[in-house]
């Protein structure tokens, strides 16, 4: 029987269906028009297979794909044209690479005959994206589409996830081929799931069994591996207190008794201080970023280090490891747990409380329960998380809003934090939140941003308007680039070099997009207006006029070790 002959563009549609793609975030243009023409028939009527979300800027397509991936556990997809359309996605691709987020970016490209001629909207996308993606490939023939798409999704989602780029030449889109579906199940020289070393597992278990002061660092890898239950069984059997990285905040419920708080520069006081006292440090699916370690040479100097990670490249990259267990933590954690003795470390656990009380009295109470003065970011976050019964997805932008909302938001469900961790991309929050509403349509999506980050992708209010995406937007407006301003006060003599911002009338902007809006100036109105936002169907923008010069504490200053964290800043 003869095989069906179809175009490369049609082959792309069928290949995406085979990968169970449901939502595509995109923006059409010249060199991707054949694909969008094929897409037309698959987004309506009886043949409908996909929802296409028309963003207002290609950067937003990449970030929306990230948000979708982070809350759904599936691969996010962005579809854009060549040249500036493709290069506009670079920040999102780099961000996804840093945070191990599985997305596939499909970009149009000029025809093969025009490659290398500086044709209109031509760019060497493969060359540009190779350093910031897991795999970047140019499709030059229609018959290669099914193979390339299947391979792209396999690489994006397997092992340590990440972004993949497909550069789709226009001639390959319109040329025909015999359709035959392809399912990629392995790639030569690519080993995404290393075999776990039983000797390393035994060594790790022995160190933990003999530890008097064990401490676990819970990272994004737990979420990516779906190892939430395995983590809890591991921690509870050996009675190990744990700190969570920024990206690992929802890997362990906030109310779990072994959760001691967030790690990092603006993390919890106890988790940072106790890192320097533990005798065995178990890092699970995290990469020892500089925001966690402070000065690496001074980090946990007394501890034996056990590092569990799926990516061998992370072992010994920053912190010297005593025992490395390379592999998927969904397998490595139970392998270690089976060898653990049932243990109790009550005195060690209780010792965290002294530091927690200090932070509670000097920082937390002042942040979330102020009685006078302007609104504070912490109290806004606290009211929002309580209004959602601690069950919402937190999406945030970058800056002070990111740190404060991550500190005070509470997590009871997995896959509940969407943030730009490694790359620190301002403008990430709004489009990522849009993606999250499609990736987790049954959940409440709360997006915090400052006036700086909001305006970097403010055009995506158009996407929210068109889709009626139910993003609950909380604008923390202090008329400053707050994080930079704080550093200027600390390290540059208080010279606020271009960090004060003149802002537009956000009420008028919301009105123009048909988005419900309110503003909170007096804290007496905060509770009622937050509850109104949460209960209102569809999108909502709540502007909060917060203190202009609010600082984020605790803070570990650059060049300091984690036990030099300060509860108060001295200018």
Predicted regions and their residues:
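Thiamine diphosphate
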Residues: 106, 114-121, 316-318, 324-326, ...
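Short, internal active-site loops enriched in acidic
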Residues: 170-173, 401, 548
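Active-site diphosphate/adenylate-binding microenvironment
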Residues: 9-13, 17, 35-39, 356-437
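Generic enzyme active-site microenvironment
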Residues: 165, 307, 395, 448-449
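Short acidic loop-to-helix transition motifs that present clustered carboxylates
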Residues: 58-63, 86, 401-403, 522-526
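N-terminal alpha/beta PP-like core and its mobile active-site loop of ThDP/TPP-dependent enzymes
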Residues: 1-347, 383, 387-390, 470-473, ...
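Phosphate/pyrophosphate-binding active-site segments
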Residues: 2-3, 143, 206, 302-398, ...
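Glycine-rich phosphate/pyrophosphate-binding beta-alpha loops
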Residues: 29-32, 83, 100, 163, ...
């Amino acid at each position: 029987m003869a095989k069906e002959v179809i175009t490369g563009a049609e082959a792309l549609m069928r290949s995406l269906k085979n990968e169970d793609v449901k939502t595509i975030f995109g923006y059409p243009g010249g060199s991707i028009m054949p694909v969008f023409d094929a897409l037309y028939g698959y987004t309506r009527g009886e043949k409908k297979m996909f929802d296409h979300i028309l963003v207002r800027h290609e950067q937003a397509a990449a970030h929306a794909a990230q948000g979708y991936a982070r809350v759904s556990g599936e691969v996010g997809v962005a579809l854009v044209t060549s040249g500036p359309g493709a290069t506009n996605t670079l920040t999102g691709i780099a961000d996804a690479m840093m945070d191990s987020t599985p997305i596939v970016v499909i970009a149009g490209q000029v025809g093969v005959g025009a490659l290398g001629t500086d044709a209109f909207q031509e760019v060497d996308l493969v060359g540009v994206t190779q350093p910031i993606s897991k795999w970047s490939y140019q499709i030059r023939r229609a018959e290669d589409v099914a193979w390339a798409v299947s391979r792209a999704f396999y690489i994006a989602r397997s092992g340590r996830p990440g972004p993949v780029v497909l550069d789709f030449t226009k001639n390959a889109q319109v040329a025909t081929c015999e359709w035959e579906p392809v399912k990629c199940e392995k790639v030569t020289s690519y080993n995404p799931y290393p075999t776990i070393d039983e000797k390393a597992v035994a060594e790790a278990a022995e160190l933990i069994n003999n530890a008097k002061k064990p401490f676990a660092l819970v990272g994004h890898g737990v979420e990516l591996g779906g190892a939430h239950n395995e983590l809890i069984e591991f921690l509870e059997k050996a009675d190990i207190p744990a700190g969570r990285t920024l990206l690992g905040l929802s890997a362990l419920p906030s109310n779990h008794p072994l959760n001691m708080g967030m790690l990092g520069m603006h993390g919890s006081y106890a988790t940072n201080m106790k890192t320097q006292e533990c005798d065995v440090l178990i890092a699970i699916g995290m990469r020892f970023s500089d925001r966690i370690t402070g000065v690496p040479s001074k980090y946990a100097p007394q501890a034996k280090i056990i590092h569990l990670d799926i990516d061998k490249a992370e072992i010994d990259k920053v912190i010297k490891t005593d025992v490395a267990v390379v592999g998927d933590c969904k397998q490595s954690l139970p392998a270690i747990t089976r060898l653990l003795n049932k243990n109790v470390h009550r005195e060690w656990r209780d010792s965290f409380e002294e530091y927690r009380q200090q932070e509670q009295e000097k920082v937390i109470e002042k942040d979330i329960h102020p009685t006078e003065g302007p609104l504070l970011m912490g109290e806004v976050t606290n009211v929002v998380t309580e209004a959602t019964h601690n069950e919402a997805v937190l999406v945030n932008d970058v800056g002070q809003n990111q740190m404060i909302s991550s500190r005070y938001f509470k997590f009871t469900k997995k896959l509940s934090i969407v943030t730009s961790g490694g790359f620190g991309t301002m403008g990430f929050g709004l489009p990522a939140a849009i993606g999250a509403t499609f990736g987790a349509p049954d959940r409440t999506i709360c997006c915090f941003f400052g006036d700086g980050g909001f305006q970097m992708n403010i055009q995506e209010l158009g996407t929210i308007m068109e889709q009626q995406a139910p993003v609950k937007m909380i604008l923390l407006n202090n008329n400053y680039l707050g994080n930079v301003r704080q550093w200027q006060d600390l390290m540059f003599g208080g010279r606020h070099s271009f960090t004060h911002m003149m802002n537009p009338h956000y009420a008028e902007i919301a009105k123009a997009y048909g988005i419900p809006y309110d503003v909170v100036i007096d804290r007496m109105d905060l509770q009622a207006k937050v509850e109104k936002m949460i209960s209102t169907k569809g999108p909502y923008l709540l502007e909060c006029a917060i203190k202009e010069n609010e600082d984020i504490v605790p803070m570990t200053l650059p060049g300091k070790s984690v036990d030099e964290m300060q509860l108060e800043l001295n200018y």
